[in-house]
Every structure is written in structure tokens, then in C-alpha cells.
Design a protein with these regions (language model features):
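Hydrophobic, lipid-facing positions within transmembrane beta-strands of outer-membrane proteins
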Residues: 1, 43-47, 96-100, 151-155, ...
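Membrane-embedded beta-barrel scaffold of Gram-negative outer-membrane proteins
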Residues: 4-14, 18, 39-96, 105-112, ...
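Transmembrane beta-strands of outer-membrane beta-barrel proteins
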Residues: 11-13, 47, 58-60, 112-114, ...
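Gram-negative outer-membrane beta-barrel transporters
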Residues: 64-66, 88-180, 256-258
């Protein structure tokens, strides 16, 4: 749905709903149960405003999306030990978010894409009955989904020196992300940066050079293994300890060439 209030300004909205039954790999290790036969439903609703003129295309929208009956086999570890067990989980997730994006062309050859998102992805019906004596059950209802930041931003300027020679930069910000289900451990926000040049030499040859992480950001991301049941009151015990996880891509130079016939 799109409705123009003026020549440049208007309203937009749309909605979709997708459904499917669980995939065969989601039965792995447990065999089918009555709960696992339930249909997965993914509704999406969004609406907002847009403004367009000769040099800018601006859109701001509110979005709601959810997914029911996620099937997961969560490996949980008893805090402070190496004991672990696999638990079958069937849960829901939902998020309400606000996104504003802009496509800007200030002068010939220059283009800027910018995007900002604030969202709150949360778990619903997420309950783990602790398989370990002395370790409390986990109720993650209302907790922020791990590995998903609440704040996202993108800034992507580019400039075509000639129709065949293009310079570009990309700045991507990921806000604070939680590293476990209880939201006891988290990673601070970070920037990921890229830049490069692309040259179409002729119809057969294209050359490129890319710089990854040119701001030389350092840090970790993802999850922390073995921390699924760790409570907030216990999180301090892990300060200054080495733990496994993912790391940001280091400063890297990449060169490419492609041939087409």
C-alpha cells in the first residue's frame, strides 16, 4: 500500500505472512514429538512515511515481525564445570523496530546510503528445565535475543570518478549484543569498516582492491560457549578470564581480478 499526500511525501505500508512445517533436520537427535509437528508462522507488518525529491529518497518505518515454534537443540553447560547436556526447545521470538533509511545523490557521481535501526527482539515461551542438580531452571521470556543488537547503523558513501572507476567506503555499527540466554554477559558496540576501489578496465577485465577494518577495531562477538545458564549474579566471576567465541576480522588488504568472455 502506497499513498501520496503530496508530490514528494506519502504513506506506505505492507504485510505478509509465511507458514511452513518443521524441516526434517529439526527432528535430528530427538525423533518427532507432538510439539514438533506444529506449524511455524512468520507474520510481518510494517508502515511509515516516505519523502522523495531529485537528490534524496527518505523512508521511515515501524516494523513488527514474529516467528512461532522455533525448534532448537540447545547444548547447556553446568556453570563452572565441563558437564553439558542437549535440551530440545520449542519457542517463539518477536521484535518491534523502527528503521530510517536514506539514498542521497548530492552531485554527479556521488551516492550515499544511510540506515538506522532500533529494535527489541525478545524470546517468548522460552523455558529450559535445568538438567543439573543445584542449578535453577531458565525462563528467558522477555530477554533480548542473543547475538542480535538493538541498534544498527550503516553509512555507505561512494563516488564514481568515471563511469568505470568507483571509490567506496562502508561503515557498519552493531550495538551492544548479549552473549548468552540470561543476558548476563554481553559485548560492547562495535564498528566494522570497509573501503575499496573498483575499476572496469574493459568488457573482459575488472580489477578491485578492498581494505577490511581500516579503523583497526579489536574485540569479540557472537556467543560465549558454556554460559547458557549463567546468571547475572555470577557474571562477575568471569572477568579477566579467557573464554571462547568469535573475533572481529583484523585489518586486511584484498585484491581481486575477474575475467569474462
Amino acid at each position: 500500500f502506497t499513498y501520496k499526500l503530496t508530490r514528494n511525501f506519502g504513506l506506505t505500508a505492507d504485510g505478509t505472512i509465511a507458514t511452513r512445517f518443521p524441516r526434517i533436520n529439526e527432528y535430528a537427535g530427538t525423533g518427532p514429538t507432538e510439539e514438533q509437528y506444529k506449524r511455524v508462522t512468520i507474520p510481518l507488518l510494517r508502515g511509515g512515511l516516505f519523502y522523495q525529491n531529485d537528490w534524496i529518497n527518505l523512508t521511515s518505518m515501524i516494523t513488527y515481525i514474529s516467528k512461532s515454534n522455533n525448534i532448537d537443540q540447545q547444548n547447556v553447560t553446568k556453570p563452572g564445570t565441563t558437564q553439558s547436556k542437549t535440551t530440545l526447545l520449542i519457542y517463539d521470538i518477536k521484535t518491534l523496530g523502527w528503521t530510517t533509511s536514506a539514498e542521497i545523490n548530492l552531485f554527479k557521481g556521488f551516492h550515499l546510503h544511510a540506515l538506522f535501526t532500533y529494535q527489541k527482539p525478545t524470546y517468548n515461551n522460552y523455558f529450559i528445565k535445568s538438567p543439573f542438580e543445584g542449578v535453577p531452571d531458565l525462563n528467558a521470556n522477555g530477554n533480548i535475543v542473543k547475538e542480535i543488537p538493538q541498534v544498527l547503523a550503516e553509512i555507505d558513501p561512494s563516488y564514481n570518478i568515471t563511469p568505470d572507476l568507483r571509490l567506496w567506503l562502508s561503515f557498519r555499527y552493531f550495538g551492544k549484543t548479549y552473549a548468552n540466554l540470561t543476558n548476563a554477559l554481553y559485548f560492547n558496540g562495535r564498528w566494522e569498516t570497509f573501503g575499496g576501489i573498483n575499476w572496469k578496465v574493459n568488457k573482459h577485465l575488472s580489477l578491485g582492491a578492498t581494505v577490511v577494518n581500516f579503523l583497526n577495531q579489536k574485540g569479540a562477538s557472537g556467543t560465549i560457549n558454556g554460559a547458557e545458564l549463567l546468571g547475572k549474579e555470577e557474571a562477575g566471576k568471569f572477568k579477566d578470564h579467557y573464554m571462547s567465541g568469535n573475533y572481529l576480522r583484523p585489518f586486511t588488504l584484498e585484491f581481486s581480478a575477474s575475467l569474462s568472455f
